[in-house]
């Protein structure tokens, strides 16, 4: 029994997964494969902001250098709070709970099935945060989108304010 790792690059505007790599290691080169897929799809003159946690792969010279070659602005979480990387956490949660199996016979089987899952996610799964559109459709659009989601910080503050005094 071995582990498989999934590196994902998600477009924050459309929620479309634009790069991924299923691998048996956590090496920088494995993360770079997903990043190269995403950068290859980037339209010319598009401004890219790359946001990630502070994983060693994303802080490496090779990964950061590739982002810099493509004139990407780099953003990273400050303190490891999952809410600072909410889109990535949400995509991971959707894939794990709705689409991806827990066990595969081998890495090749995992890669094939996960590629299918990502296709379903990108082209069939509707998102409330996208006003019930699918990521592939939103990815072709421009301009503001109607967003529907719960704001953790706002609702937490409201709860705090509405509590009776003790």
Q: Which positions does each model-derived feature cover?
A:
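RNase H-like DDE/DDD metal-dependent nuclease/strand-transfer catalytic core used by mobile genetic elements
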Residues: 1-8, 12-120
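C-terminal domain-tail junction helix/linker
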Residues: 68-72, 94-166
């Amino acid at each position: 029994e071995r582990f498989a790792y999934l590196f994902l690059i998600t477009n924050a505007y459309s929620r479309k997964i634009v790069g991924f790599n299923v691998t048996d290691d956590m090496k920088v080169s494995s993360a770079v494969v997903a990043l190269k897929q995403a950068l290859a799809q980037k339209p010319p003159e598009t401004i890219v902001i790359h946001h990630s946690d502070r994983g060693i792969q994303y802080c490496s010279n090779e990964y950061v250098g590739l982002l810099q070659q493509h004139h990407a602005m780099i953003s990273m979480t400050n303190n490891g709070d999952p809410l600072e990387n909410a889109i990535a956490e949400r995509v991971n949660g959707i894939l794990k709970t709705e689409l991806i199996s827990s066990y595969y016979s081998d890495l090749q089987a995992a890669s094939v099935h996960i590629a299918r899952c990502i296709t379903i996610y990108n082209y069939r799964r509707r998102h409330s945060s996208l006003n019930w559109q699918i990521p592939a459709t939103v990815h072709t659009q421009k301009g503001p989108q109607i967003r529907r989601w719960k704001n953790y910080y706002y609702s937490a503050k409201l709860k705090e304010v509405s509590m009776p005094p003790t």
